[in-house]
Amino acid sequence: MRSAATALRLEPVAAALLLVWLLVVNVGTLGGVYFYTHAPVPAVWAGAVAAWGGAFACFGAAALLQFLVGFYAGLLALPLLWHAPSRARLLALAPWVAGLALVYVPFTLSGLADTGALSNDAFVEIYAYLRHPHHLVPSTWPWSLWQRKGLFYLGAWYLLHRTSAGRPTLERTVLHFALALAALTLAANWLFVEIVPSSLVTKLQPARVTPLVQVVVLALLATRVASFLARRHWLLAAAVAVAPFSLFPGLVLALAGVLSPALLAPSAPRWPLWLLGAATVVAFRPFGGDFDYHAARHAPWLGLWLVACLPAWLATRPATLCTAAAVAVGLALTAASAPDRLPLGLSRRFAPNQPPLDAPGRLGARFRAHSTPNAVVLAAPSDEMWSFKLHARRALVVDDKNIAFTAAGLREWRDRFTHILGVPFVPGVDPGAAWRAQPPNQLLAIARHYGATHLVDRFDWHATPPGHLIDREGDWGLWALPPP
């Protein structure tokens, strides 16, 4: 982050703002993807405690080279190499191409090994329409989402264009290239998923370029905030700084672009200041929701920005810096070792094995403590089963989160869902309704077919599930199944 701030010539306040934007803001992303996600990543903790950590180490190395991230990030960086010397360009491109090859060659070979497992159309149907519609099917994304993202990029482009006097030409080149790349990849997403299905394009998940494009736009906006602060245009800097957190970021940025000539003039009139200030306040909808709502929505990023401003101040005070570091490390270690003694907000941030918060998660945590590692569970097709599996650390017959993303793996996943639901698992089917329609004796037969020893279900879905009840939490129950 410090290197990026130095390259962009950002002062500490603007650098802290960019950091907060990258951690919190998602105004420019589509397809349910984010530059930084606040959700836990179970694989990290699983890799730390697994006896076969070498496999996770190899998986981590592959993730660093993964095609989805390395390919798009490399494309966005290409404009930076256009005017570079040939040797520097070669030294930059060689590792990128080598990394792509390390992923793309096995990727292609695994596809060849799966020849005949699924047709191209069937692969796209399962991978996109059944498993990842939120990532891959643009027609399922709300129109309001498209409008908000489009207005953000349009408003940001207009502001950057209107305030580009004296800025490097490369800056405009990078901006236009990033926006054009986003438009082209989203068009390819729609064309090769919904019109002419292509398994290759589907696997690349083109919408994943949008978080990286958002990074480019936010970094350029941070340079404008730094410039406005240096010229003491406080209100203009504040409006641009808080715009991405508002409900209408694109409109605030566009209005700032419209008013920027008047606001940046040596003798600026007062009415543009009042207009921009009023529009910024209204963009946060101050008259909707009570004080608690606004505090919960905006206090975290404001507090994070204040904390992010501290390193620059602490850097000039070594003794204070050491004290602050010791306090931070002490709090983290305390929260990790004794999460029950601290507020939930702290324990959830620092505890590597945070406690479950929902009924299936608490059920899974108790099941893990009283079951063998080889236990297999037949679970209802519900999103909440992810929490159960996370805390139980036991195998499920099938669930909607975990799947082998090969042709053979996708086919097995679809076949298992079809088996437990009793109806073909196709787009539009209601898994919950199909599960509820299955009689208890059929659930027992399915469990025995896959070697399941336990069943997780809701009491309002089946009045008399097979087996005997061994635990319950809220509306959820856990049954031990009779041996065959």
Question: Which residues does each PLM region occupy?
Answer:
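Transmembrane helix interruption/hinge and helix-loop junction motifs
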Residues: 9-10, 50-52, 65-69, 86, ...
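Short periplasmic/luminal acceptor-recognition loop of GT-C membrane glycosyltransferases, typified by
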Residues: 333-345, 354-431, 445-461
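Membrane-interfacial loop-to-transmembrane alpha-helix junctions, especially the N-terminal start
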Residues: 8-16, 92-93, 168-184, 226-240, ...
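Aromatic/acidic, Gly/Pro-rich catalytic loop(s) in extracytoplasmic/lumenal soluble domains
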Residues: 439-484
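Transmembrane helical bundles and short interhelical boundary loops of multi-pass, membrane-embedded
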Residues: 239-384, 395
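Membrane-embedded helix bundles of polyisoprenyl
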Residues: 2, 14-81, 93-108, 281
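Transmembrane catalytic cores of multi-pass membrane glycosyltransferases
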Residues: 27, 67-73, 82-218, 222, ...
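Transmembrane alpha-helical segments
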Residues: 4-5, 46-52, 74-82, 156-157, ...
